[in-house]
Every structure is written in structure tokens, then in C-alpha cells.
Amino acid sequence: MLSSKLFCVLFFCLGLSNGWPQFDFMNQMGFGGGFNNGPHPNSRPGSRPNSPLGDIFGNINGMVKGITDQIGKIAQGLDVNNDLGKMAHGPPPPQSEWVEHARRFCRRFPGHPKCRGQLPQFNDIGSMLNGILVDSGKWLPKVPFINIRDPLSGINSDLKNALNGIQVQFGQISQQFANNIRNICQQMNCKQQQQKNVQMKQAILKQTVDFEKKVFGNNVADKMNLRFDRTLQLKQALLEKAQLKGVVAPEDNGVFDKDLLLTETQANFMLNELGKGGEGAIPMPGSAKAKRASIFFEQNLIQKWPSTSPIPYTFDSSLDNLDQNDVRGAISEIEQKTCIRFKYFASPPKGNHINYQKVNSPSFCGLSYIGRVEPANPVYLSFQCGNGRGIAVHETMHALGVNHQHLRMDRDKHIKVDWSNINPQQYDAFVVADSKLYTTYGVKYAYDSIMHYNAYTGAVNIAKPTMIPLVNQQANIGLLGQRAKMSNADVEILNKMYCKSAGCDDKNVYCGAWALQDLCNNPNHNVWMRSNCRKSCNFC
């Protein structure tokens, strides 16, 4: 097994090839509490005169190839694309080995032109892999159709009009903003996939496959690859919606919005919102019949943890005592400020639970799913970004069902996104979340939310912010991305999600938006709001 030290060195080295490994990622994410959320230094660490770090980095860089080869061997067999990519740089393999890889590729991409009627040959390897990063969706199994309920169907026209300027069509940006992104791509290569993205996805894949095989006895390599493929397909669809298809290839790192893992159901829902329902080669088993969906938290309790019993959690053996203390501190903060309770298990229990795992990687600070997922919620933490407790709070809140603050449907009323300075390949980190998926519950926007990203997230010019507060800019820009503690707004939203009595709920995802416009007690809507928006309006 690859040692934790080897993992650490591997990801550190990969970061070096793209600038400043720690400042570039952690500070922009807002997770590196030690960097004060300010502009980046204007010299790369280790390049200063007489700095011993320069020699150290040089020696580490010399180790990259050998380490990369090692992790490739360890992850071999989990991702056929990765295997084929390595195979393309060597001599033809034995025919039996090639046939196995070709079959796996065609099972994963049944619509690929080289998989129609016969298996591809080794000399087809270039065309097999070409285009996957730009438009892989048409070769994957079909995205199932989902009949998504319109939450505004039958709603009073005044309430509909109240959403003008707030309700944003998922993935839509102005032509001017799209042109800003195109201009960036004239100055940088927006289609090249960085090696750190490939390695990050392989590390997550291996960690997940090992966990589910160990705990549940399941081999989930194919399932995880489809999740990653759907995540990439979603990123591609968002770029297409912004008329950036063919201009930008998104980061193929297995995650969405920098630290979110998506289930296939979540990805399929958003793909349907982007008009991709039915796209693909052949129907997925059992997907011929269109499904009715409403993923809004109040109406889809599969994503919510039961409030009647403590949430089970456990630690992977990869966490040392200090790491465990950080997570316990995070859990303690949530318990002290809300009604939510957790229960520790020394070994993974049967059924749903949160499993905290350590991945020694400065390529990310933490990763999590949103809401409860089957069969368990892995939370991946690197403990290399400063303030491990605050990062654990952030990722645990994702597991509880909370999305990022800066992606709220009303975010453009509170921050300005500088589209002329964002990394185009990280476009998904700036797209306002699907308004049918998440509600604000009437909680005001909070610059100091522990769920907000840093002001310099995804910046091309890392001396300039990508997110600028529209209120009291000088004071609030330093609050963005703080990981010191939960804000009052973070506490309020968890209490509304989990700590209200039975029957205290919202019946419409836009209740929170209406509540923030003081429509709860409006004489024209009071009766309807009392019946349908009890939680967001604080009527219970």
C-alpha cells in the first residue's frame, strides 16, 4: 500500500507544476486559515534568494515521475481511461490485455464511434480518448428523463414577480460575462487537463472503492466512474449553456464546485435542468420510464438525516489523534449550537453514517456529498490547510445538506463576481446553484458564513479578488472564506433544517426568497404564506 508520506509528497509535487501549491489552492478556497484571506505573495515559495526551500522543492520535483508511476500502478484497473492514457505512451500490450481494456471502455462509453459493432483496436486509442473532456456525454449511457415539477405552477403572479432578479436560470450568464471568459482563454490554454486533476480523481476513486469494499463488501469502481463521468458531463453542459462549448474543457477531477461529490441522482437532476435528459447512447437499466422528482430538501427526506436519533460517525484508521480531535471539535461546535446530535462508533456501523477519512493531499482541503447518501457518507479531509476543525465543520455541514453560501440564488445582490478574472476551467465553482434544489429558509446572506469561499477563489490574477462584497467591501472581503467558527446564519439554517417540530415545514422551495422580501406578513399573501411557508416565515 502506498504510504501516507508518499501520498503527501505526490500531491505536493503535482501542485508545484502549476504555481504555488498551497497558496494557489488553499487561500483561494478560503480553507487555509493561516493565510488571512488576503492577496497572494508575489513570489513563489522557495524561489526567494538563499531560501533552503528552493533546493527542497527541486529535489521533490525530481521525485515526481517515480511517484506518479507508483500511484498509477496502485490505481490500475479502477479507471479504464487512466489505464488507456498510460498505455498510449508505451508499446502495444498483449492482445488479451488490450481486449479486456477495450471491452471496459465500451461498457463505459457505449456510444463511442469505435465501439459500434466491434471492439476498437490498439491503434484507435487516440480517437478513443479524444474529445472525452469536451463532450463525453453523448457517448455515455443515456441520462434518464426526469419530470421536474415546476415549483411556481399555480403560484400567485405577485409572488412570481417577486422573484424577478433573484430566480436565475441554472447555468445562464450574460453574453458579456461569457465574452470575458473567452478573452481569458486567449491568454491561457483552457483545454489542457492538468496532471493534478487526474491524480486527484484517481486518489478519490481509490479511497472510495477501498472504503466500500472494506466496510460493505461492494466493488463500486463502475458506479464511482459513472458518478465522475456524470459530474464531468454536468460541467460540460454548464459550459455549453454559457456558449463556451469547445472553448473550455472543465477540470476532470471528479468533484463539483471544488469540494462537492455528486451522486448520480443529483447529477442527473441538474443535467435534466440543462436539457440533457435522454442524451446518451443506450438507456440505463430501469431508466426507460420517466421519473418524477422534487429534490427540494423538505420534500425529499432521503437526503435528510433523521432528527429522532443521533447521527452515527466513525473515523478511518488514516486519522491520527490530532486529526480526530479536529473532527470532534467540529462535531462539538455543531452540537453546542444546534439540536443535532452525533454518536461515535469505533468501527463502521451498518446503515447510514458519516465516515471521516484522511487523504494526504494539498490539492484539496476537504470533500463531501451534500445530504445523506447511500450506503454511507465519506468525508475526505487532508488536514493540510490550517484550521482543520473549521474545515471539518464546513464538510460536515455539506453532509447535513447545506450548500455553499456564495451560490445562493440571491448571491448577485450581495457579491459581484469578476468574470474577467476567473479560471474558465473552474466555471462550475461560480454558477449560481439550481434554484429548485436549495432554499435559504429566510436566512439572510452572511459574508462570514463558514460555507462561503474566499474572495480569491479561482482567480487568474491572484492579486485580484473574484468575489467582491457589495456591502462594506473593505470590512467584509476579509470575512469571506473564514473557517474560525460557524456564523449566526450557519447556526440558524441548521436549526431550521433539523430542529423544528413535526409539521413545521415549507411547501415551496422559494419560501425563503419570499420571506427575505418581507412577504410573510404581507396582507395580500399572509394566509397563503402561513399555510405554505411556515418554516421560512418563522410561523412555527
From Swiss-Prot:
Domain of life: Eukaryota
Family matches, as CDD domains: ZnMc_astacin_like
Textual note on the cofactor: Binds 1 zinc ion per subunit.
Active-site residue numbers: E395
Signal sequence bounds: none
Molecular function via GO: metalloendopeptidase activity; zinc ion binding
Known EC number: 3.4.24.-
Gene3D superfamilies, per the entry: Collagenase (Catalytic Domain), ShTK domain-like
Stretches assigned to the ShKT domain: 504-540
Record key words, sorted: Disulfide bond, Hydrolase, Metal-binding, Metalloprotease, Protease, Zinc, Zymogen
Residues annotated as domain Peptidase M12A: 293-500
InterPro entries: Astacin-like_dom, MetalloPept_cat_dom_sf, Peptidase_M12A, Peptidase_M12A_astacin-9/10/11, Peptidase_Metallo, ShKT_dom
Binding site for Zn(2+): H394, H398, H404
Cofactor: Zn(2+)
Gene Ontology BP term (one): proteolysis
Disulfide bonds: C339-C499, C365-C385, C504-C540, C511-C533, C520-C537
Entry function: Metalloprotease.
Name the record gives this protein: Zinc metalloproteinase nas-10
Organism: Caenorhabditis elegans
Taxon lineage: Eukaryota, Metazoa, Ecdysozoa, Nematoda, Chromadorea
